[in-house]
């Protein structure tokens, strides 16, 4: 984005011409910026080559999701609707993670029927329901368990999700209990430690503290994810 002779341009297209063609207000997305952000993320994590999952709740525009799919990324969804959009954008099921609180039985059944990569669970009750569905479906489902790392994200109080007093995620004690209880389950495979500490985080320090807490509990559990 830049100014040329007093006019604002987005990827060499003037904002004025966009407004004349589509009217205002109008949302404008930069493919160039999105692609550069993705490449930058991949570059910084190239030594471990992770599966990068785009948060569909941040932008469910199908054109954006189509681009995400073409670039080989996965998707993180929090509802059946988002899962359907991700699939419609040709994002491979084995690259889709279903996260979030309040998943319905219908949503869990749908996700399992689509053979997605992973379901991040928020409670023991959710694991119990997944086991029931898996038993009837004769499948073994990959799950994650959300851990509360008791980390201050240094963000707005109402969007903080990683402190002990927040309602999200499980305490260390509960997490270790569920890990032990379900590690030999015939119907769920604990494949992931899930964690989320908040939004609008402007410093790397909260992430460093979070990773220290995650590393500690993994070592204590002696479990190989």
What function would you assign to each model-found segment?
Residues 55, 142-148, 194-196:
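Short beta-strand segments
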Residues 150-225:
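Active-site loop/helix belt of alpha/beta enzymes
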Residues 73-75, 99, 143, 161, ...:
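Short glycine-rich loop/turn motifs that provide flexible caps or phosphate-binding loops at active sites
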Residues 1-141, 180, 185-189, 222-223:
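A charged N-terminal "starter" segment
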Residues 102-103, 124-126, 148-152, 198-200:
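Short acidic/polar capping segments at secondary-structure boundaries
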């Amino acid at each position: 984005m830049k100014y040329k002779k007093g006019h604002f341009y987005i990827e060499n297209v003037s904002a004025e011409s966009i407004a004349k063609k589509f009217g205002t207000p109008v949302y404008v997305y930069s493919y160039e910026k999105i692609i550069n952000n993705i490449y930058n993320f991949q570059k910084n994590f190239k030594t471990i080559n992770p599966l990068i999952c785009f948060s569909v709740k941040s932008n469910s525009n199908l054109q954006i999701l189509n681009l995400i799919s073409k670039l080989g990324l996965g998707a993180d969804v929090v509802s059946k609707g988002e899962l359907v959009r991700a699939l419609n954008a040709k994002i491979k099921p084995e690259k889709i993670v279903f996260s979030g609180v309040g998943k319905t039985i219908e949503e869990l059944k749908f996700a399992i029927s689509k053979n997605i990569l992973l379901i991040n669970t928020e409670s023991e009750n959710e694991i119990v329901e997944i086991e029931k569905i898996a038993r009837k479906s004769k499948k073994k489902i990959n799950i994650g368990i959300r851990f509360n790392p008791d980390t201050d994200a240094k963000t707005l109080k109402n969007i903080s999700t990683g402190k002990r007093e927040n309602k999200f995620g499980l305490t260390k004690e509960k997490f270790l209990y569920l890990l032990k209880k379900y590690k030999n389950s015939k119907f769920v495979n604990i494949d992931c430690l899930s964690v989320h500490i908040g939004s609008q985080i402007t410093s790397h320090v909260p992430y460093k503290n979070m990773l220290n807490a995650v590393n500690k509990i993994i070592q204590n559990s002696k479990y190989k994810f």
